[in-house]
Amino acid sequence: MKDTIVAPITAPGTAAVAVVRLSGDRAREIAQSAFSARLKNRVSVYGALLDEEGRVLDRALCVLFEGPGSYTGEDVVELSLHGSPLLVREAVALFCARGARLAGRGEFTRRAFLNGKLDLTAAEGVMEVIDAATPAELRAAASHLGGRTF
């Protein structure tokens, strides 16, 4: 995939922490342009998320996962912010203004499938785990994550 996508990967609403994920060719560049500390592969780095004027929006943890060793098989950046819905919207808008586009539902998993990181059963299992409403549904869905069926 040539474009870079961004979306919150935690449930919407107020929480202690929210995570925003970027994936694609420019994920590292876009995230680094708005983060005060230097990103390092597979290292959680503490720094500031900066707005367009360089003002601090939040103090955050940021992790870079260089492709192909990431969930999607592409460069991925995950930013752990305080869980304010406004802050999450601002972070996503900031990354979109710098060249990312808003990811569609399931698009990170779709990319993982297309890049050979998940087989079809595992990709469907991710969505089933997310949508599970009962313990039995959750157990059945979790069994698909490894790509096996019963």
Residue spans for each PLM region:
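A glycine-rich (often HGG/GG-containing) alpha/beta subdomain
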Residues: 1-139, 143-147
